[in-house]
Amino acid sequence: MNHVKKPDWLKINIGANARYTETKHIVDSHKLHTICSSGRCPNMGECWGKGTATFMIGGEICTRSCKFCNTQTGRPLPLDPEEPTHVAESIQLMKLSHAVITSVDRDDLDDLGAAHWAKTISEIKRLNPETTTEVLIPDFQGKSELIQLVIDAKPDIISHNMETVRRISPLVRSAANYATSLKVIKQIANNGITAKSGIMVGLGERPEEVEEVMDDLLAQGCKILTIGQYLQPTHRHYPVAEYITPDQFKQYRTIGLKKGFREVESAPLVRSSYHAEKHIKFKG
């Protein structure tokens, strides 16, 4: 596939202000991981500059090797039993009104990391009773009893990303699959928790396939959708097929809202947790 030139609208300014430096210090001093840095998120400068970050639990090594993701793959270290408390303390220090947590996949663990997830949410609530929480979870191999452990910890929003359209999913996701992800979304929604999902575009999908994902998500009870441009992390990752124009992103947002989503964040640099603090108003 030929190299596709990155357009001007994807150029970003990563400026570091005092709040950015403070956020970095808190994250580093608590030996925490963020998807902002491991995933090379283009919004890191903006978010850290506002004092927000998406914490990544379960370590920094993932057991899966999806072709779009920059997170390190390999054999993870044992879970840090102090991590849930360290995350909760960092949220307290950062005075966050809304916290976003995600994780690597831990297919090496008997419970795939579900109990660690539940403990982290509980610790956040214990130390930050006024802070709302959004968690971006893996599929837990579709095991409903493990998904339920996270649901029972009662975060305000649970997100699970479809990542891409049905046709491209097996090409870029190493273990997850489209049907299992829909099952996760359905279980979240059926338990009365606001369900959220996200996809990348620019992988070679067609607009009608994006609409199919929207319809599939709405049928499971999903309320919030994020759509952003796929950016190839390194030459070893899946190539960008196309850079979607800002106008097409706006069109996707309009279509999604008309179909019934409560909110659709759709722009080239949108990522799963972008403007997450604004999504809490769509809870319930």
UniProtKB/Swiss-Prot annotation:
- InterPro entries recorded for this chain? Aldolase_TIM, Elp3/MiaA/NifB-like_rSAM, Lipoyl_synth, rSAM
**A single GO CC term, please?**
cytoplasm
Cofactor(s) this protein cannot do without: [4Fe-4S] cluster
Instruction: Give UniProt keywords alphabetically.
Output: 4Fe-4S, Cytoplasm, Iron, Iron-sulfur, Metal-binding, S-adenosyl-L-methionine, Transferase
Report domain Radical SAM core positions: 48-262
Report the domain of life of the source organism: Bacteria
Where it mainly occurs, coarsely classed, is: cytoplasm
Its recorded reaction(s) are: [[Fe-S] cluster scaffold protein carrying a second [4Fe-4S](2+) cluster] + N(6)-octanoyl-L-lysyl-[protein] + 2 oxidized [2Fe-2S]-[ferredoxin] + 2 S-adenosyl-L-methionine + 4 H(+) = [[Fe-S] cluster scaffold protein] + N(6)-[(R)-dihydrolipoyl]-L-lysyl-[protein] + 4 Fe(3+) + 2 hydrogen sulfide + 2 5'-deoxyadenosine + 2 L-methionine + 2 reduced [2Fe-2S]-[ferredoxin]
Q: What class of enzyme is it?
A: transferase
Functional pathway: Protein modification; protein lipoylation via endogenous pathway; protein N(6)-(lipoyl)lysine from octanoyl-[acyl-carrier-protein]: step 2/2
Cite the binding residues for [4Fe-4S] cluster 2. C62, C66, C69
Which residues are [4Fe-4S] cluster 1-binding?
A: C36, C41, C47, S273
The record's GO molecular-function terms, alphabetically, read: 4 iron, 4 sulfur cluster binding; lipoate synthase activity; metal ion binding
* Enzyme Commission (EC) number: 2.8.1.8
Q: Where in the cell is it found?
A: Cytoplasm
The entry's free-text remark on the cofactor is:
Binds 2 [4Fe-4S] clusters per subunit. One cluster is coordinated with 3 cysteines and an exchangeable S-adenosyl-L-methionine.
Give the record's family classification: Belongs to the radical SAM superfamily. Lipoyl synthase family.
Q: What is this protein called?
A: Lipoyl synthase
Q: Which gene encodes it?
A: lipA
